[in-house]
Curated annotation (Swiss-Prot):
Activated by phosphorylation. It is an enzyme of class 5 (isomerase). PROSITE patterns: PGM_PMM. Its EC number is 5.4.2.10. It comes from Aliivibrio fischeri (strain MJ11). This is Phosphoglucosamine mutase. The lineage of its organism: Bacteria, Pseudomonadati, Pseudomonadota, Gammaproteobacteria, Vibrionales. It catalyses: alpha-D-glucosamine 1-phosphate = D-glucosamine 6-phosphate. The modification Phosphoserine is found at residue 102.
Length: 445
């Protein structure tokens, strides 16, 4: 397959105002997508966004490009990424488009696409869009121009869907939950879901202003949530990222519960109910503790490359239903077509309510190996991973760890970062080894 020019692992993403996240490019992207999608069936596209101030500008640019290609754009306003996937299916649209940079700061943004089935676009469709981007932009005749409209009931539809994934015989009555919406797209969705199911809720990160998305709140920074859970003596806390496809939880003692632990709880509960189909997909970053805990339960486990796209590929390949990344992407294919943080949270809470156990007690069956992740920023065309010094440092650490740990070096798919991960039984040694490799990476940049 030809090398991608514009699409990364999660659509097109970058710094707003710099290529490719400029109004002219995004308009051309809308047109190029329209050229491809118009040949596939209906000419209706669902468009959602998170709460970044640049979303308004990029929304208008997309609208112009799609209209020039003759497509009808249906705008949801601020809406979680998985909600757009769901609405794309229920409205029988040809595609869904999300304007978001997920967990990144407000000054980044991006465009990602969903197919009519609510899944990420196949590689061949993305490559077809890239091919159109390199052609001169044209416009259909005036009578065939696309029109734009708003989906005023989008939020209500998605709230009802989320609630439908929670067992009808259970209730959240009596639970005190702290909800952190990262000042992002779930701010008007998640509180209503949990409240309508009976919980007492306390919210943080629910006051977006266009520039505070993911800032010291949300799934990538749970310190505020940890403090609030302890202060309020809540049963637990739930944090979402800016576009609502990642979840991190916090137990009653303020301890973080990541995507690995969440997937373990959901899989174990499905096994208890006799409803587990197959095994669990993790990634190269998944904690060894999860692998060991699942093995002890007799649940198969495989690893994919990092990225929810690759988790999904492994799930489909094995015909399994549960996949996750430790960063908080949790995919439950019996309920959704992509990572959905609210739905994942509800399944964990169903386990809490159904088992009459606390979140901490549910996590106790899985002992986490100490895992240190160091991000090293790099610039230029050189590849630090090809450095002999880096290879030597990695080999040295792997020899010291033996069978009792792992080393993983990889490039980020969305930022100019080398991610150095070291995992083992001794936290102090793991930290030392990770820094040893990170120093070698820095020196090679």
């Amino acid at each position: 397959m030809a090398e991608r020019k514009y699409f990364g692992t999660d659509g097109v993403r970058g710094l707003v105002g710099q290529a490719p996240i400029t109004p002219d490019f995004v308009m051309k992207l809308g047109w190029a997508a329209g050229q491809v999608l118009a040949k596939q069936g209906t000419k209706k596209v669902i468009i959602g966004k998170d709460t970044r101030i640049s979303g308004y500008m990029l929304e208008s640019a997309l609208e112009a490009g799609l209209a020039a290609a003759g497509l009808q754009a249906k705008f949801t306003g601020p809406m979680p990424t998985p909600a757009v996937a769901y609405l794309t299916q229920t409205f029988r649209a040809e595609a869904g488009i999300v304007i978001s940079a997920s967990h990144n700061p407000y000054y980044d943004n991006g465009i990602k696409f969903f197919s009519s089935e609510g899944t990420k676009l196949p590689d061949d469709v993305e490559m077809a869009i890239e091919a159109e981007l390199d052609k001169p932009m044209t416009c259909v005749e005036s009578a065939l121009l696309g029109k734009a409209s708003r989906l005023n009931d989008a939020a209500g539809r998605y709230i009802e869907f989320c609630k439908s994934t929670f067992p009808k015989e259970l209730s959240l009555a009596g639970l005190k939950i702290v909800i952190d919406c990262a000042n992002g797209a779930t701010y008007h969705i998640a509180p209503n879901v949990f409240k309508e199911l009976g919980a007492e809720i306390i919210t943080i990160g629910c006051e977006p202003n266009g520039t505070n998305i993911n800032h010291e709140v949300g799934a990538t920074d749970v310190r505020a949530l940890q403090a609030k859970v302890v202060e309020e003596k809540a049963d637990f806390g739930v944090a979402f990222d800016g576009d609502g496809d990642r979840i991190i939880m916090v137990d009653e003692f303020g301890e973080k519960v990541d995507g690995d632990q969440i997937a373990y709880i959901i899989a174990r509960d499905a096994l208890r109910r006799g409803e587990l189909k197959g095994g669990v997909v993790g990634t190269l970053m998944t904690n060894m503790g999860m692998e060991v805990a699942l093995r002890n339960l007799g649940i198969p486990f495989v690893r994919s490359d990092v990225g929810d796209r690759y988790v999904m590929e492994k799930l489909l390949e094995n015909n399994w239903l549960i996949g996750a990344e430790n960063s908080g992407h949790v995919i439950l294919l019996d309920k959704v077509t992509t990572g959905d943080a609210i739905v994942a949270a509800l399944q964990v809470i169903a386990s809490i309510v159904g088992s009459k156990m606390s979140l901490k007690e549910l996590c106790d069956g899985m002992s986490m190996f100490p895992q240190i992740l160091v991000n090293v920023r790099f610039a230029g065309d050189n590849d630090p991973l090809e450095s002999e010094a880096v290879k030597a440092a990695q080999a040295d650490v792997e020899a010291k760890l033996g069978d009792n740990g792992r080393v993983l070096l990889r490039k980020s798919g969305t930022e100019p970062l080398i991610r150095v991960m070291v995992e083992g039984e001794d936290a102090e040694l793991v930290t030392q080894y990770a820094q040893q490799i990170a120093d070698a990476v820095k020196e090679s940049c």
